[in-house]
Amino acid sequence: MGMKSPNIAAFMLPLLLILFTLSSQLKVVESTGRKLAWGFSGTPIVYTPPSRSCGTSPAVFTSKWRRPRPCRLPPGSYIPASDQSP
């Protein structure tokens, strides 16, 4: 029974060291374009476009951050200006 404690300690110490090393390397970044980076080198993994972009998916897996594209509406769709009544 007394031999179990050293075995558990010998297993947990390297495991905790690896866990601490990995957790110190990870970064979570949120900027104006809602760029989420969660990686070892700081490269963005998930990019969420701003809310004013229309028709795009909420999250795009990418290895490089790109500028958001201008809003493009499908042909035939019309959005009235706010100062005009429909």
Curated annotation (Swiss-Prot):
Keyword Transit peptide in annotation: no
Motif segment (SCOOP motif): 45-58
GO cellular component: apoplast; plasma membrane
Gene Ontology molecular function: LRR domain binding; receptor serine/threonine kinase binding
UniProt key word Cell membrane: yes
Keywords assigned: Apoplast, Cell membrane, Cleavage on pair of basic residues, Membrane, Secreted, Signal
Induction conditions: Induced by cold, drought and salt stress, but repressed by pathogenic bacteria Pseudomonas syringae pv. tomato (Pst) DC3000, jasmonate (MeJA), ethylene (ET) and salicylic acid (SA), mainly in shoots.
Residue positions of motif SxS motif essential for MIK2 binding: 51-53
Biological processes per GO annotation: response to bacterium; response to cold; response to ethylene; response to jasmonic acid; response to salicylic acid; response to salt stress; response to water deprivation
Tissue expression pattern: Mostly expressed in leaves, and, to a lower extent, in roots, stems, siliques, seeds and flowers.
Localisation per UniProt entry: Cell membrane; Secreted, Extracellular space, Apoplast
Source organism superkingdom: Eukaryota
Disruption phenotype: Slightly increased growth and fresh weight.
Residues spanning the signal sequence: 1-31
Annotated family: Belongs to the serine rich endogenous peptide (SCOOP) phytocytokine family.
Quaternary context: Interacts with MIK2 (via extracellular leucine-rich repeat domain); this interaction triggers the formation of complex between MIK2 and the BAK1/SERK3 and SERK4 coreceptors, and subsequent BAK1 activation by phosphorylation.
Function: Brassicaceae-specific phytocytokine (plant endogenous peptide released into the apoplast) perceived by MIK2 in a BAK1/SERK3 and SERK4 coreceptors-dependent manner, that modulates various physiological and antimicrobial processes including growth prevention and reactive oxygen species (ROS) response regulation. Prevents general growth and development.
The protein's name in its UniProt record: Secreted transmembrane peptide 6
